[in-house]
Amino acid sequence: MRSEALLLYFTLLHFAGAGFPEDSEPISISHGNYTKQYPVFVGHKPGRNTTQRHRLDIQMIMIMNGTLYIAARDHIYTVDIDTSHTEEIYCSKKLTWKSRQADVDTCRMKGKHKDECHNFIKVLLKKNDDALFVCGTNAFNPSCRNYKMDTLEPFGDEFSGMARCPYDAKHANVALFADGKLYSATVTDFLAIDAVIYRSLGESPTLRTVKHDSKWLKEPYFVQAVDYGDYIYFFFREIAVEYNTMGKVVFPRVAQVCKNDMGGSQRVLEKQWTSFLKARLNCSVPGDSHFYFNILQAVTDVIRINGRDVVLATFSTPYNSIPGSAVCAYDMLDIASVFTGRFKEQKSPDSTWTPVPDERVPKPRPGCCAGSSSLERYATSNEFPDDTLNFIKTHPLMDEAVPSIFNRPWFLRTMVRYRLTKIAVDTAAGPYQNHTVVFLGSEKGIILKFLARIGNSGFLNDSLFLEEMSVYNSEKCSYDGVEDKRIMGMQLDRASSSLYVAFSTCVIKVPLGRCERHGKCKKTCIASRDPYCGWIKEGGACSHLSPNSRLTFEQDIERGNTDGLGDCHNSFVALNGHSSSLLPSTTTSDSTAQEGYESRGGMLDWKHLLDSPDSTDPLGAVSSHNHQDKKGVIRESYLKGHDQLVPVTLLAIAVILAFVMGAVFSGITVYCVCDHRRKDVAVVQRKEKELTHSRRGSMSSVTKLSGLFGDTQSKDPKPEAILTPLMHNGKLATPGNTAKMLIKADQHHLDLTALPTPESTPTLQQKRKPSRGSREWERNQNLINACTKDMPPMGSPVIPTDLPLRASPSHIPSVVVLPITQQGYQHEYVDQPKMSEVAQMALEDQAATLEYKTIKEHLSSKSPNHGVNLVENLDSLPPKVPQREASLGPPGASLSQTGLSKRLEMHHSSSYGVDYKRSYPTNSLTRSHQATTLKRNNTNSSNSSHLSRNQSFGRGDNPPPAPQRVDSIQVHSSQPSGQAVTVSRQPSLNAYNSLTRSGLKRTPSLKPDVPPKPSFAPLSTSMKPNDACT
């Protein structure tokens, strides 16, 4: 069972490591408002004018023998670490080394800027106990000197710094002294083409790497040099020669050279390294496809952790990619093991790099130091065989890469916009000096503080993110308004518990721990898990713990257990990435804060606090001694931590119930909204359907007169009405002899854009006329048509047309025949006294009945059998009505506002031609006079008849407008005579001076079909005597 559990654990660990780890959050955060209290060095001496400043251009800092050395441009400053500093750090000594004017002039002649033609100190080493070795760029002419450590006075001769110091301050270089010899790595020419790892000084011969050989070095950037055992290790990054086909791929490298290397023979590798080997450093996130951090930024010296010698290195992504940084740890034994592995070679310039088989490796093995256990018979490297020397010359690259501990980064930082560039380690942190704390510096002036936790195997397997600090002081470090936040170097001094952080314009002294921020809050002090801080029981405050402290204190570095400790109200330390409180901690604001807290039941009055004249910035500086005198600021309940937590089961149930209730509520809301919309749509559709049916029943017979003849409103105050040709005067006769308006004119807006405009057709007044019903009306018309069938037509001019005369059962007749006497005209066009609509309707009904009886008697007297049969047959036959009508008069005709009278004259001649003629009389006669004229015409001719139906559209005084065109219809008769029947319509052009005897009454249609071409014929007023049906 135990073995299965272990197997499951390692499987889960493997899968957990396969994914990309997330960034850890800091326990504590210190912003710039708090760290600006730290002392700053800007190049001043004590007692001097502090307002004057000059550009420092700090290149590096070092701590030697309790003294901080600051290497800058043209100067070296020393600072006594033991001297306490409050606001500003003053230098104790200052060394000035400026370039000679001749070197400056030469530098300017080579095209360099005057700011570059200075002496930038790039090498500052302790040569021995009494001397310093210093090298500078010296206006692109590197030079080196020796100085006394205590007085900073030069001694000895100045010598060339070529291959020891770079020409340009921007170029990277490393150097160290080992066994009295200087090992340096830099460039040796003005153009920085020849990169070299160089050994000089001392009794050993000068050695260097092979010149202009990309297999040895290809555009390297040197980071660190480490002395370990029999070798000197150089850490750098360069363009990977084994990946030339993929472009400029940069790999981190580690190279080794033997300390006792004396160079090769006179034939091979003379005055060159015979032990130079290099290998790749692997710092990547494991997975199916490894994610590599290839830009090496900084490397520590060899440090000892739990009995193992390791180096810590910071890596980052390329500068043209997304920012990301990682810290990897390497065991020195792993590095040495790689250099004893297989070599890598390229057989041809176009081939890939492959491992070299072991049988091809010569003896003695290349890369070993002379006099070692495997090369005891070779006292010096000059005695190596040529095969060994030739092989090491062409095969300096190892096949395998140096793996990091646990094959994964020790720390990752990928969700930020900066890269980690510097590193400093305290391997004896805490009161018992048993913890390892790492400080990482970034290019944005931010320092990250980590606790290195050691696993059971003795290797680094986890890290604890303790603190994040923003230490750059913009007020004191900016120069000419420019803020350069890149960290140039970090030096840790364990004796003073300080970390010196160097920028290009200043140096800031940062305490290793910020214990005073916790004040008298025990919970935050323990939860910070800072090895430098502890809860002092005697003073009841969180204080810094010095090594071998005899004070009684409490710490919990491994777990940070705070069970039973109450919350604090006077701490703004961020725990687990979140600020626990933002209450101020300065002495001047404590009383004000306490008063506001007590008066409001535990809530601090921030407005009162900020408005107080004695208050300071809530995020301002805090002194460590201010918290010792505070009273009544801490509120601790001493409740068990688990009592304040919510059970996971209850939390899960609450979440599920909240989700279900939200889903139900959402469903009900959606249903209600959809149902409401569905009802609205149904109501709209029902209304549209009813409106469609009403329109369909009225459109074929209803005409909007106001839209047809113009937009001018009638003078009659009565509302406008739609007129129908089937009902007299637009009114519907009801059994009660009451007239009703059919349809209001403003209820329908007909599309009459194709009809004449108001400019050509004046406005007509509308009126309605009662009707006796469509069925009775049709019988009367059929009887009248029957009585005129056998009568000879009256001679009149006929206008021919090609349009046939058709009748359709579904077509509402627009041309009907009515017997109209001359009294009808008088009724329509002569001003009469107003009478009620009921009286008018009764009078018209009597006239219609009289006409019907007269026609019937006439038919019976003329031809009894023929007339009766004809009358009976016509009751069931619809009238023959032309399908196209509604000709309009010319625009220039004189119109009247009294009403519109349309009449068609029908003449029977010997050729049986029927002529429909429309005329508009100007004079109206009485009905009795009309009847007399009709009887007189019947005595002259019994075969001709003129019947007129008068449709009045208004009660105005003026005559109706004349039509604009004439439709002529010619019908070929089927009678034996072979004569044609012609129906014509034409306007009256005689200014309405004569009145026709009888005619056909036409009604306007709603919308005429395609009109024929207008044709005009002279109006003939000569008529033959006709016989009217009596």
Curated annotation (Swiss-Prot):
Residues 937-952 have a biased composition (Low complexity). Gene3D superfamilies: ligand-binding face of the semaphorins, domain 2, YVTN repeat-like/Quinoprotein amine dehydrogenase. The keyword Transit peptide does not apply. Residues 920-936, 970-997, 1018-1030 have a biased composition (Polar residues). One of its GO terms (molecular function) is chemorepellent activity. It is found in: Cell membrane. Its main location: membrane. GO terms for biological process: animal organ morphogenesis; apoptotic process; axon guidance; cell surface receptor signaling pathway; cellular response to vascular endothelial growth factor stimulus; cytoskeleton organization; negative regulation of angiogenesis; negative regulation of cell adhesion involved in sprouting angiogenesis. Residues 671-1030 are cytoplasmic. It is a single-pass type I membrane protein. Belongs to the semaphorin family. Active as a homodimer or oligomer. The SEMA6A homodimer interacts with a PLXNA2 homodimer, giving rise to a heterotetramer. Interacts with EVL. Cell surface receptor for PLXNA2 that plays an important role in cell-cell signaling. Required for normal granule cell migration in the developing cerebellum. Promotes reorganization of the actin cytoskeleton and plays an important role in axon guidance in the developing central nervous system. Can act as repulsive axon guidance cue. Has repulsive action towards migrating granular neurons. May play a role in channeling sympathetic axons into the sympathetic chains and controlling the temporal sequence of sympathetic target innervation. This is Semaphorin-6A. The lineage of its organism: Eukaryota, Metazoa, Chordata, Craniata, Vertebrata.
